[in-house]
Amino acid sequence: MRGCLQVLRWLSTSTARRPVSSRPLHEIFPKSEFRRPFTSTILRQAQASRNVSDLEKRIADIPIERFRNFCIVAHVDHGKSTLSDRLLELTGVIQPGSNKQVLDKLDVERERGITVKAQTCTMLYNHNGEDYLLHLIDTPGHVDFRAEVSRSYASCGGALLLVDASQGVQAQTVANFYLAFAQGLELVPVLNKVDLPSADPERALEQMRSSFELDTDNAIKVSAKTGLNVAQLLPTVIERIPAPVGDHTKPLRMLLVDSWYSTYKGVILLVRVFDGEIRAGDQVVSFATGLKYFVGEVGIMYPDQTPQTTLRAGQVGYIYFNPGMKRSKEAKIGDTFTKVGFEKKVEPLPGFEEPKSMVFVAAYPSDADHFEHLEDSVNQLVLNDRSITVQKESSEALGAGFRLGFLGTLHCSVFEDRLRHEHGASILITPPTVPVKVIYKDGKEVTITNPAHFPDEDDIRAKVAELREPYVMATLTFPDEYLGKVIELCEANRGIQHTLEYFTPTQVILKYELPLGQLVEDFFGKLKGSTKGYATLDYEEAGWKVSNIVKLQLLVNKKSVDAVARIVHYSQAERLGKQWVTKFKEHVDRQMFEIIIQAAVGRKIVARETIKPYRKDVLAKLHAADIGRKRKLLEKQKEGRKRLNAVGNVVIDHSAFQAFLSK
């Protein structure tokens, strides 16, 4: 205030002293002195809102007949995300060369070159003088994220069936093709990486014809890396993929495709509007939970969140609520939303089912003092992935930790990487286990995910009718020269052969029914080793089968180390038990008393190792001829060892568990 008064006083005195000039200010003062460049927040927001409104006006003029929702179907690492980048550049959503894998938001996705979370982007494209609104959904290719894939397909009218020209059709191409075919999607065959020296387009096209019975005469040959022929894709999408069906005048019917957590806005939902319209201020209700919310904002991904006034039937976009949805468990993927008051007039969309965890691990902090940090890290990651189940558990050996459930082994590995890299967590992860079903004689059925809850031998004899384990139908593709080795591997893992087909003279598709427990025990690594890396694997659930499964425990001086117990098939208990005791012995320090390490199934010991104690030479000071004194001292030492064994606790360092649990 004082400064403003001084300026006013100076201006009044200066004008009183000087004659008033008739010249304009820009002639009196040089341009650089007269104008001070500045940028205000209000000005920036006004410019942003003006750009958004221009975009919104252009979208509002496009009827639903000129909407196209499509995705890319491919095996992992066949170039989906790179092709998505080229399409975004082609439609002006991003600048050429400005980013790589725009739709891969997670660090782990960029590091591994895989897509984990389904992402979407809206594009505007002018074709024959008319604007088209295109929604591209980049889906994961790996089997663990099949739920993400199937939900994404439900939002689409068609798909680009992308095949690597050098590698040809592979297992996940086959699995994802049938998933897309079952959803009734229009498929456009596309060959990628045709610029590679190893590319063989004719062989790849022949595989597509024989495997999928597709007409490949109009297949588009592209290079996502260089942009070769990518410009042909969008006109083909417009001409061949049908427009979504919907009516914006009907009551709202909206599918929840995905969700993620924002610190400031709560849970943000990725949605596909089938009928009606949604805008900020509307009150909506979930069919799965019955909970009601007020909409705070709606918008499209362009490629980041871009607010809009309304989302219409046929559009894919995001919404968040005000007050925000704070618990990500409320966002049930595949759920249907409608406006409050229309619940009885709207049919929920079919196909909603909760994702089921099929692989379980226990996670403990390397240092017990870091449990709170691990808990915070796990909770933050679970906010963005509702398919992970979390239960607290405690181990005598490792202290407090968590029992985590995942969709598959890659899902587990990605979560572990994110814990270590994004949150700096130092953790111990136990080997993965799968759930088992216990059918009791009274008809009660219990699913067990923690080996600690597995019934003991006496209960199994007296109360249990049967035990079951989950099976999967595995699809393997590989060159026929490795057929013998692959069949041998599958048989060694208790597999049951179903079909064997040649989809080219040298390529085989083999289908085997395998126990899921065998699959998570590094089956894929062994398969890659048997085929020099040429095999691909995909699988789907195949129900439960009666099995002779047992609980294998590690005992140290007859005390169970609960953290490493596993449920295994009886035929593998002895082999695995020998591996356990041998490996554990390497990492446990010698102590003043004997340490006995055993692997046990119930009361039966299947393997044993002994760590001898340190021994003091009590005879060092005795005369050689003093036999009676020698015997007396040795007996005394033996009695002392018995007392020490009775009261001594084996102290096992965390580093021993870390080394034992590492592969």
Swiss-Prot record:
Claim: Magnesium is one of the keywords in the record: no
Binding site for GTP: 74-81, 138-142, 192-195
Gene Ontology terms, MF aspect: GTP binding; GTPase activity; mitochondrial ribosome binding
UniProt keyword annotations, A-Z: GTP-binding, Hydrolase, Membrane, Mitochondrion, Mitochondrion inner membrane, Nucleotide-binding, Protein biosynthesis, Transit peptide
GO biological process annotation, one example: translation
Entries under PROSITE patterns matching the protein: G_TR_1, G_TR_2
Predominant localisation class: mitochondrion
Top-level lineage group: Eukaryota
UniProt similarity note: Belongs to the TRAFAC class translation factor GTPase superfamily. Classic translation factor GTPase family. LepA subfamily.
HAMAP family: LepA (MF_00071)
Function, as annotated: Promotes mitochondrial protein synthesis. May act as a fidelity factor of the translation reaction, by catalyzing a one-codon backward translocation of tRNAs on improperly translocated ribosomes. Binds to mitochondrial ribosomes in a GTP-dependent manner.
Name the record gives this protein: Translation factor guf1, mitochondrial
Species of provenance: Talaromyces marneffei (strain ATCC 18224 / CBS 334.59 / QM 7333)
